[in-house]
Amino acid sequence: MKLNKYIDHTLLKQDAKKKQIDSLLSEAREYGFASVCVNPTWVEHAKKGLEGTDVKVCTVVGFPLGATTSAVKAFETKEAIQNGADEIDMVINVGALKSGNLALVESDIRAVVEASGDKLVKVIIEACLLTDQEKVVVCQLAQKAGADCVKTSTGFSTGGATIADVTLMRETVGSDMGVKAAGGARSYADALAFVEAGATRIGTSAGVAILKGELADGDY
């Protein structure tokens, strides 16, 4: 198994410096990760830094709270793509889901999907804040709205990916969508377990350590 192709090599910290982003890009080129995931302000820089490789540029929308309006999320998406983003990881409107406003949750996702054109859209459900029933419902809404993938976590809330959540999400969406486990893989064994549970992507800042068989520090 080429585990490197499952990994979105991630640096989303608000205090990330250019030299840290450059290090992320260098590691992505060396290890051939599926993508780098960076904040929107770094998309254009990342695109230039990955020219000549097959590493995708992934960025985040409505991040990390998901509480911006759908119009803002759509604008963020369009601008990110103009700047070179290949993949969009958007955060759902968690408050709307918790309030039972499923129409808003779905239309919010759909706004990003429509703004993305042919680019990959992953929907962050922030599983640590949801009941199992809410996880099932929002995965179904993401599927209905035309998203490509559902993702467990932002890495900025109360918890990251769990095997139970990845399993439930995979069972809910079937084989038609991707499932991204984010914020829970600290070792090669962790990453492998997520893949075996149904993950097609793993979001982590510890991709290099994972591939080296080391135990990584940190929380994403």
UniProtKB/Swiss-Prot annotation:
It comes from the Bacteria. Pathway: Carbohydrate degradation; 2-deoxy-D-ribose 1-phosphate degradation; D-glyceraldehyde 3-phosphate and acetaldehyde from 2-deoxy-alpha-D-ribose 1-phosphate: step 2/2. The active site is at D89, K151, K180. Keywords: Cytoplasm, Lyase, Schiff base. Gene3D superfamilies: Aldolase class I. Belongs to the DeoC/FbaB aldolase family. DeoC type 1 subfamily. Catalyzes a reversible aldol reaction between acetaldehyde and D-glyceraldehyde 3-phosphate to generate 2-deoxy-D-ribose 5-phosphate. PANTHER family: DEOXYRIBOSE-PHOSPHATE ALDOLASE (PTHR10889:SF1). This is Deoxyribose-phosphate aldolase.
